[in-house]
């Protein structure tokens, strides 16, 4: 069949163009090392691949959150460990201070040391993270949470905000403990009230004062603090307790009063050890929680009062209350440290799980996406040879004419 010159050029150009196009299409796969780049390469595999990549991306986000939450909880746990160590020193020195052989100068020296401990815990409570934010200020990370006042009291300037991060599907972890819950919400060792002893000639002690019946606890009709007056109206040597509220309204009279035996009024249960004297008066002020700073301040005030206490018996009673609260504060700090430790255990568990899951996902992704280099290179070389052969054939045929046969 006779082939025109134009047809010859067209057919050969088309052949080389197709082979060149085939070669060019293979280049991106080789350069990227991927078998599937777009949906048109393999629509089914591309869909599966998208699922794998989304899951891997989500784990990467979880892992970023894990790093952040781990850093914060490690810092929190360390802060509580330092605080607990300091509180143990506070307890040790306060026990040493209860020695009649000590002079006022000795007690003042211990009080000065207590002030150093207060400063140390305050520094811990005002700790910052790696980005410069206060870790115990709640959501007010730019606001110093605790401020020392001239009288050694401490005020909280943060809020109660708690932040969480997602570290797994439906798994969230706290990354902070606000300062009020960390250092101020320590349960009162006596219960829900703190006693003050207006007169305590008999040397009795309030050992327990709790709201044991919330339904009967009426703070509108009978607001706290509650005054307990010890009387003997019958002059029979048997004490009664006249209970009045903050407005001096009478609530009830406990008759007879029995030392060590609990009595109740307005939903409140009270136990008093020892025998009060007629005319003694105690006041129960509502105080469910006591901050760690209040406790250390109380210890400092007790020490600085020294031998000048008007009532040495009452001074010893106050000592017992303060020591009990020091013990309660130390235990509370240990529990808060434990909460940070539990968070770290959860974080580490999720981190390990993500490592296993990510390995499985990467294997699945690789089986779909990654290129078989040996096969791809072989195919590329074959296509390259085919193109070269077509080019050489065209070049040789292009140089032929009728004169070559004469």
Show where each model-derived region lies.
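Amphipathic alpha-helical polymerization modules
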Residues: 1-151, 173, 301-406
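Cysteine-poor, low-complexity segments in flexible/peripheral regions
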Residues: 144-311
